[in-house]
């Protein structure tokens, strides 16, 4: 069960997508909230669209059990059966970047389920194909090595740590070309209202600058 229904998810996603991550970062700072800016990752594609979604957390680590190669990986099964519209995959790969936590097939499956994007401190492969999907991603690296034999999913729907930020299930993730901002679900309304004030002020200043330059 999710905290918000589809209509509520759409409201928050569409409203947060109106703002750059810089406005959200400033809003959280103004409100005295802990920084939600994720550090140390990069956009898969500098031209990827701005996106927002609710954290669907997955924690992975180097595989300790044998994989028989027959069944779906646990990550694929979670994507196929537990994701829904408005989710944004958040995969903590315990800093492993020598192995790809996923690729184009998993991204396609997620996109078809209504997932808005992916955030991981691990690596991905099939980068060109994922970029062609217009599936927004922030990641820690790239690797052609597949994960099935070497990594396993050990937890889902738990708090994870990525880029210095604790991300809890249902936190809102906003990603654009500048970076990633995480807004705790308990503070969605106040952060959004503060971001509106910040953007309105910036727009007024920009208008004054343009008038002065004309």
Predicted regions located by residue number:
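Channel- or pocket-lining gating/hinge segments that regulate access to a cavity or pore
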Residues: 179-181
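C-terminal binding/interaction regions
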Residues: 173
């Amino acid at each position: 069960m999710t905290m918000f229904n589809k209509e509520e998810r759409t409201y928050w996603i569409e409203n947060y997508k109106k703002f750059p991550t810089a406005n959200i970062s400033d809003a959280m700072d103004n409100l005295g909230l802990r920084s939600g800016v994720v550090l140390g990752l990069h956009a898969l594609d500098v031209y990827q669209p701005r996106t927002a979604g609710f954290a669907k957390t997955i924690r992975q680590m180097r595989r300790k059990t044998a994989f028989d190669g027959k069944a779906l990986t646990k990550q694929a099964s979670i994507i196929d059966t537990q994701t829904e519209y408005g989710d944004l995959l958040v995969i903590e790969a315990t800093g492993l970047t020598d192995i790809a936590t996923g690729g184009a097939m998993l991204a396609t499956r997620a996109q078809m389920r209504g997932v808005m994007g992916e955030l991981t401190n691990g690596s991905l492969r099939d980068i060109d194909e994922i970029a062609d999907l217009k599936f927004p991603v922030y990641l820690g690296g790239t690797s052609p090595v597949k994960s099935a034999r070497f990594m396993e999913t050990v937890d889902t729907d738990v708090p994870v740590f990525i880029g210095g930020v604790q991300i809890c299930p249902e936190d809102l993730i906003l990603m654009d070309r500048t970076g990633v901002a995480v807004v705790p679900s308990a503070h969605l309304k106040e952060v959004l209202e503060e971001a509106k004030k910040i953007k309105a002020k910036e727009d007024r200043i920009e208008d004054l600058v343009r008038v002065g330059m004309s």
